[in-house]
Amino acid sequence: MIRFPLCFVIIAFALPVFATEDPTIRELSAEEVTDLMDGGTIRDIARGTPLRAEVIGLIEAPRDELSTILLDYPQIPEWAPATEDVEVVGTDDECTFIEGVTKIPWPISDRTWRMCSRGGDETIDGQEAFVYRFDHVEGTGNIDTSFGFWVLYSLPDHPEWTYVRYVVNADPGIAIPQAILRWVTNGALPDLISGLRARHGELY
């Protein structure tokens, strides 16, 4: 089952119990790098409970500028078209809590969520990277669970390009038709990369 959001986001004043998938960097072949520099994306969906979806792209922009866009939570709908009404509702020592709505095509009703979000620089697979994690706050919204991450790092051989990987594991609490999975694969996932790229162009 699923939910995206971009992706993300998070809220509530409960002590969050974080789900797990450790952020990693997927190695790219030379052919994949060329395709991604031309605007392509790598996308994957794995059925299960939760459903797992991911997208990888390359953006010609500094990592720090892109990470700033990711952490500007109220502005997420400006570049993530499936996400609406994002609001910061609190913070604690570990998280910024945000809530929002993921717009899903008919016949699925929109998904609402609260999440715990945190981001910062880490070393991932030997690379200095920015990592943004998000986890659904149990018992909030109308989804069962959602958790995942973004990883951003500068390509060693092409430092002007930033590798962007988004992974989400999600169970929206309802069965997901095949048509919705196609929408995720062909629309929602690549839209995150193109939207982030366009938002950077607007701001910088």
Where are these regions (language model features)?
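Cleavable N-terminal signal peptides
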Residues: 6-7, 17
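Hydrophobic/aromatic beta-strand elements that line small-molecule binding cavities or substrate pockets
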Residues: 55-57, 86-87, 102, 112-121, ...
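Long, compositionally biased interface segments
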Residues: 176-204
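A short, structured loop/turn motif at beta-sheet edges
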Residues: 60-63, 89-94, 119-129, 153-163
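Positively charged n-region of N-terminal signal peptides that target proteins for export
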Residues: 1-4
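Hydrophobic ligand-binding cavity/cleft-lining segments
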Residues: 19-93, 191
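Beta-strand/loop substructures that line and gate deep hydrophobic ligand-binding cavities in soluble
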Residues: 135-187
